[in-house]
């Protein structure tokens, strides 16, 4: 039998998982002066790039922690707060100035950090089965028949694939709200060359000016076509192009990113495509884009969304996040359109950005949206602080109807949380030597809409890496390790970022009411 033995194995090469094993390897070496045996295995082709959806999925526009002006001033913070130290290092080594991450630089930075930490890599892995001793995982058997033994395991996949193989029960889609088929859309990112920021600004402005000018009959025909001949929708789209002061909602270009603020470019594409600009009806949309500005007149677009059910999201994740034929067909139309506007090339990513694919159950301490609004874990336990809105891009299908049916007629928009991070929602109680560090961790209610963000999960991953070493050196399981133990290491090594969680108890109570009310029937069916 081909048997390989390690201390820690991570399945999945999403950035939080990669930084978790680097964190673990460094901590083990600090404590023992020896290199640990750590293995990072992935379904993906690591030769194509290391870093999951940020690299092979081409998601160059990073979602950063968003700290309010008030907190920035009172606590002397920068706009992105105080990121986890290992994330800061990764961004610095990848040459990120604010938002834009060059995939080739990211993979080079991660590879160098992995080599330096002595982490082994394994590509294109399929799990055949899992061996367990009692509740604990003892080894992973791959489809090639090799047995990989370890003491502690980390699952960094969007769908909790290792956890599922180990018998962990997963809530599909938004089953936490009794909506097991509903899922967030997936994105096929693409990169354009030859379309300058200046040219894109001009196009955006021209489209805005024309679509909002009712006397421009040709432009109004295009607008009506994009609205699927629905005059009411055409009017709504027109109104979305103007702000409250009556000014055109032109795109915003920062140093290394562009935020498209109106549907003008989307209208232009959808009229060209002959498809109604209505995501709930068609399931495909060129949305208002988040665009990263890369060197050599390259732009990386997070804009093309595809609706998926929870079972489709799961199937895509299991299939290595590869785009479907239908998605490839759509990108060919996007390519034709963008080339007509001046792009010299349009290159789609080799993998999809899957935002969410369910959540595991049976963690040590589940994390809800209400807990985030209340400020997260106590400051004395905190490993970092994160601030981000409850972002369900593309919407959760059926949530409005579900809320009304349960008697909730208040707003579904909740305040942005600024909360302290721990690791206990990522540690499995049911499989005590396993942690799930991804959008699939033990989130309940609205928590996954914030908890799916990479920067947040890196803080969790750094903590889990340290926890895994604590567990190994003290002959314990991951599930036994407290936030305080991990925090102690961060303090000792000068790695603890600023902690500034905000307890918003009023909004926290409101969201707790909503989460409890909407999830009541979901919990009853478990």
Language model regions located:
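Conserved beta-strand elements of the Class I
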Residues: 7-9, 39, 435
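Mobile, glycine-rich extracellular loop/lid and propeptide segments
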Residues: 15-21, 51, 114, 126-128, ...
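Soluble non-cytosolic domains of exported or imported proteins
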Residues: 14-15, 100-105, 455, 480
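Beta1/beta-strand and adjacent pyrophosphate-binding region of the FAD-binding site
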Residues: 2-16
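Flavin (FAD/FMN)-binding glycine-rich loop and adjacent Rossmann-like elements that form
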Residues: 53, 146, 150, 157-463, ...
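Conserved N-terminal/central alpha/beta ligand/cofactor-binding core
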Residues: 29-129, 180, 184-186
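Conserved beta-strand-loop-beta-strand element in the redox core of flavoprotein oxidoreductases
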Residues: 131-147
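A short, Lys/Arg-enriched amphipathic alpha-helix followed by its capping loop at the start of a domain
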Residues: 20-36, 152
């Amino acid at each position: 039998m081909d048997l390989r033995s390690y201390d820690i194995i991570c399945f999945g090469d999403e950035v939080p998982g990669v930084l978790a094993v680097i964190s673990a390897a460094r901590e083990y070496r600090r404590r023992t002066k020896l290199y640990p045996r750590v293995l990072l295995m992935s379904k993906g082709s690591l030769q194509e790039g290391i870093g999951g959806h940020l690299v092979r999925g081409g998601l160059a526009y990073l979602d950063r922690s968003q700290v309010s002006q008030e907190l920035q001033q009172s606590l002397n913070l920068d706009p992105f707060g105080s990121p986890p130290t290992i994330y800061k290092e990764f961004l610095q080594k990848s040459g990120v100035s604010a938002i834009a991450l060059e995939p080739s630089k990211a993979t080079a930075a991660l590879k160098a950090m992995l080599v330096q930490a002595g982490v082994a890599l394994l590509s294109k892995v399929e799990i055949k089965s899992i061996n367990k001793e009692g509740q604990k995982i003892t080894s992973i058997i791959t489809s090639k028949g090799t047995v990989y033994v370890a003491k502690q395991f980390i699952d960094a996949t969007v769908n909790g694939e290792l956890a599922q193989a180990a018998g962990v029960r997963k809530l599909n889609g938004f089953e936490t709200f009794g909506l097991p088929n509903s899922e967030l859309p997936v994105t096929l990112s693409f990169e354009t060359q030859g379309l300058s920021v200046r040219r894109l600004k001009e196009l955006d402005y021209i489209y805005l000016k024309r679509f909002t000018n009712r006397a421009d009959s040709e432009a109004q025909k295009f607008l009506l076509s994009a609205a699927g001949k629905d005059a009411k929708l055409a009017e709504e789209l027109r109104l979305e192009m103007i702000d409250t002061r009556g000014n055109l909602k032109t795109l915003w270009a920062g140093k290394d990113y562009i935020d498209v603020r109106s549907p003008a470019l989307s209208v232009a594409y959808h009229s060209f495509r002959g498809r109604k600009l209505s995501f709930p009806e068609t399931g495909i949309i060129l949305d208002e884009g988040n665009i990263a500005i890369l060197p050599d007149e390259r732009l990386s677009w997070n804009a093309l969304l595809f609706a998926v059910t929870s079972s489709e999201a799961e199937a895509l994740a299991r299939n290595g996040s590869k785009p479907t034929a239908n998605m490839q067909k759509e990108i060919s139309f996007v390519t034709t359109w963008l080339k007509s506007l001046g792009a010299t090339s349009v290159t789609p990513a080799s993998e999809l950005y899957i935002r969410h694919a369910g959540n595991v159950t049976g963690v040590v301490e589940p994390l809800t949206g209400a807990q985030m609004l209340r400020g997260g874990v106590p400051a004395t336990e905190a490993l970092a602080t994160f601030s981000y809105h409850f972002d369900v891009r593309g919407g959760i299908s059926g949530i409005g109807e579900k809320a009304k049916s349960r008697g909730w007629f208040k707003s579904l928009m909740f305040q942005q949380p600024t909360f302290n991070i721990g690791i206990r929602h990522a540690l499995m109680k049911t499989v005590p030597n396993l942690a799930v560090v991804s959008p699939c961790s033990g989130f309940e209610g609205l928590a996954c809409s914030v908890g799916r963000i990479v920067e947040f999960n890196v803080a969790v991953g750094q903590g889990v890496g340290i926890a895994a070493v604590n567990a190994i050196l003290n002959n314990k399981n991951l599930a036994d390790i407290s936030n305080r133990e991990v925090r102690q290491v961060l303090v000792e090594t000068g790695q603890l970022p600023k902690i500034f969680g905000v307890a918003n108890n009023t909004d926290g109570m409101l969201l707790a009411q909503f989460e409890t009310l909407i999830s009541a029937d979901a919990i009853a069916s478990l």
